[in-house]
Structures are given as C-alpha cells and as structure tokens.
Amino acid sequence: MSAKIIDGKRLSQEVRAECRARAARLAEKGTQPGLAVVIVGDNPASRVYVRNKAKACGETGIYSEVHEFPENANQDEVIGRIQELNGNPGIHGILVQLPLPRHFDSSRVTESVAVEKDVDGFHLYNVGALVTGSSIFPPCTPNGVMKMLEKYDIPIEGQHAVIVGRSNIVGKPMALMLLQKGATVTICTSRTRNLAEHTSRADILIVAAGKPRLITAMMVKPGATVIDVGINRLSDGKLAGDVDFESVKEKAGYITPVPGGVGPMTIAMLLCNTVVAAEQAHARLQGN
C-alpha cells in the first residue's frame, strides 16, 4: 500500500484563488487589503519566508510592506514601529517574523500588535478566543492543516489524533482545533517516553518536533493520516521533514510531503486572515 499524497501546493492555490477574489471585491469598494511584516536580524530562513510572503501577497491583490531592523535593534524601537502600524488605516494585518533575537521579549513584541490586526493569531486575546472556539484569526499553520483534512475528506470526529510537538505556534493550537472538531487528542514531545506507543495508535498523526525523520514506519498505524509540519535542512543541504517520508508513505493512508505540504498552506491561511482583517476594517468604516 502506498499513501495518497496530500498536495499542499495545489490546495494552497485553490485557497489563494478564493482570497484573491475576496480581495478584488474589497478593492472595488475602495479597500485594498494591506499586510506589514516586521523582521529583526539576518536569519536566512526568516528572510526567505518574508520574501515568499511578499510574493504571495502581490499575487493575491494584497498590498504588503516589510519593516526591517538590524540584529542589535532596540526592542522599544521595534514596538514603536508596530504601534505606528496599528494606527495606519491602510495596514490591516501585522506579522512579526519569528524568531526574534535573544535579547527580545517575544511575547511583549507580539502582544503589541493590535488584536484586530493580529493575523498570526498570537495575541493573548486571540489565543483565548481559540480556547473558547471563537477565534477570528486562527494560527496559520494549524488552520492550514485543518483545511487539508477538510479538503481531503479525512474524518476528525471520533478519531484519535496524536500531536508530536507542544509549541504555542503549532502543537497547542492544533490540539485545540482538533478538540473542537470532536477528536480525542494526545500531545507528545520528542522526549516522550515510549513515543512509538502513542504515535502507533494515532488515526491522525501530526508531527511538529523539529527533529529530522523522527517518525519512522514502525511508529505509524497502518492507514493513518500523517501530517509533517517539520522542515529541517540537512548537512548535505537537502530539506527533510520530521517524518521519514519514504518509509512512512508505504504504511500511511495519507501523507504530506516536505517541501510542498504544510508550508504552502501556512502562507495561504495568512493571506486569508489578512483579507478577513481588511473585510472587518471595511465593515467598521461603513458602520456595520
């Protein structure tokens, strides 16, 4: 048996087409969605992500601008810029590119983004809304995973979902979103004892541990859906996920590749959140 490949690249194009149509309708009414990205330092991966986001915005009809700061930037200076963007009516979404330099308090910086412009979903208000099932801006990567499961008609209710990784960006919000859809959820880490005992019981296995090829075929239930959120650069320069794709694809029912799986969906959901923020801003202007 060979798993069906969940094509994140193709699916992201469908999602982006929907966003493009909504952005065009807004533009006809006089509001072009706008996204500002704040980046601090010279992290090569972060710069690639920012370029990809800017390119995707241009292709979707979203205005974008990048605010760059050096590695030794003052935190208050960065927060001051974010506060300026909070008051800019032409900017509807603000994204702080993580990670920030070590001398920054990441929570304080992300908390400085206005709630209504928090398209990454990292503000405490939006985190709380996610807990209660009323989030307007769900975090982009978990939301992209949920969209994948939906589009491929993969059942969630009543299924056992195992998440490897407990980050605030992926693991924890992913668990909440699956719980809201009726899954039984187990959260593990790369240090969980007898990890394979947990992963091998999963109907849906989502891996976001940052450990290349952590999950092997022997750790996967036959026919399971395997979502690989990890992306790691190996010593030979090649990219690898947290799942040993070649072996696991022979055992899983569905699997995402790396690259071309979750990554494109993350950007697509960021675009959607930005359009939603612009739609809400336009409605406020109209007094609705």
Curated annotation (Swiss-Prot):
Keywords: Amino-acid biosynthesis, Histidine biosynthesis, Hydrolase, Methionine biosynthesis, Multifunctional enzyme, NADP, One-carbon metabolism, Oxidoreductase, Purine biosynthesis
InterPro entries: Aminoacid_DH-like_N_sf, NAD(P)-bd_dom_sf, THF_DH/CycHdrlase, THF_DH/CycHdrlase_cat_dom, THF_DH/CycHdrlase_CS, THF_DH/CycHdrlase_NAD-bd_dom
Known role: Catalyzes the oxidation of 5,10-methylenetetrahydrofolate to 5,10-methenyltetrahydrofolate and then the hydrolysis of 5,10-methenyltetrahydrofolate to 10-formyltetrahydrofolate.
Binding site for NADP(+): G165, R166, S167, S190, I231
GO molecular function: methenyltetrahydrofolate cyclohydrolase activity; methylenetetrahydrofolate dehydrogenase (NADP+) activity
EC id: 1.5.1.5, 3.5.4.9
Pfam families: THF_DHG_CYH (PF00763), THF_DHG_CYH_C (PF02882)
Catalytic activity, as annotated: (6R)-5,10-methylene-5,6,7,8-tetrahydrofolate + NADP(+) = (6R)-5,10-methenyltetrahydrofolate + NADPH; (6R)-5,10-methenyltetrahydrofolate + H2O = (6R)-10-formyltetrahydrofolate + H(+)
Subunit structure comment from the entry: Homodimer.
Entry keyword Oxidoreductase: yes
GO biological processes: L-histidine biosynthetic process; methionine biosynthetic process; purine nucleotide biosynthetic process; tetrahydrofolate interconversion
Pathway: One-carbon metabolism; tetrahydrofolate interconversion
The name this protein goes by in its record: Bifunctional protein FolD
CDD domains: NAD_bind_m-THF_DH_Cyclohyd (cd01080)
Domain of life: Bacteria
HAMAP family: THF_DHG_CYH
Native source species: Nitrosospira multiformis (strain ATCC 25196 / NCIMB 11849 / C 71)
Family from the record: Belongs to the tetrahydrofolate dehydrogenase/cyclohydrolase family.
CC annotations in GO: cytosol
NCBIfam families: PRK10792.1 (NF008058), PRK14186.1 (NF010783), PRK14189.1 (NF010786)
PANTHER family per UniProt: C-1-TETRAHYDROFOLATE SYNTHASE, CYTOPLASMIC (PTHR48099:SF5), C-1-TETRAHYDROFOLATE SYNTHASE, CYTOPLASMIC-RELATED (PTHR48099)
Protein encoded by which gene: folD
